[in-house]
């Protein structure tokens, strides 16, 4: 089964949107910062691992660096302070690891979206397909996609789109971009 690039990007972007609050927690010396950071890292790691991204292991490696002071023999500083020090040193790398996963996905999705917007514009202007309320929205989108994938001049672009995103993602992008009132 092909995994939705849109879904992966949304999940990881949502995790990144939570990141500023973690940084603020460190800055404000929030007592729960380490627990919140660990929970965030575990959730992000799970998303990455579940979608077969090796960066999940990198996040786990950063977690191990933060946990390591708990097992150090030195007693010069408390383990918690050493953990906070390590966490502050790796925060950017943690965020950047997730960003580096999202960025190429986002580039492909944006390219596919631009191609789809172009194809939709051409199709709408040609009036080759019109929307009427007797068919449901999903059928309407499927009808447009069928035109894209069978029309001699549009087919190369639809093939290019499928090299960037799955067909399900392409249909979802189309659903986001279509304003039905313009298709009547």
Predicted regions mapped to residue ranges:
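Charged/polar low-complexity intrinsically disordered segments, enriched in acidic residues
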Residues: 110-157
């Amino acid at each position: 089964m092909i995994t939705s690039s849109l879904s992966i990007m949304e999940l990881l972007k949502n995790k990144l949107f939570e990141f500023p609050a973690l940084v603020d927690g460190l800055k404000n010396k929030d007592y729960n910062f380490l627990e919140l950071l660990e929970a965030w890292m575990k959730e992000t790691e799970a998303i990455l691992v579940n979608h077969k991204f090796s960066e999940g292991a990198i996040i786990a490696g950063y977690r191990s660096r933060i946990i390591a002071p708990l097992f150090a023999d030195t007693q010069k500083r408390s383990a918690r302070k050493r953990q906070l020090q390590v966490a502050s040193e790796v925060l950017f790398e943690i965020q950047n690891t997730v960003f580096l996963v999202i960025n190429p996905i986002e580039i492909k999705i944006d390219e596919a979206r631009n191609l789809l917007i172009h194809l939709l514009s051409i199709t709408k202007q040609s009036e080759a397909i019109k929307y009427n309320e007797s068919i449901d929205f999903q059928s309407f989108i499927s009808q447009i996609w069928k035109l894209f994938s069978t029309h001699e001049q549009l087919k190369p672009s639809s093939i290019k789109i499928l090299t960037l995103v799955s067909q399900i993602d392409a249909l979802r992008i189309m659903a986001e971009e279509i304003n039905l009132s313009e298709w009547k």
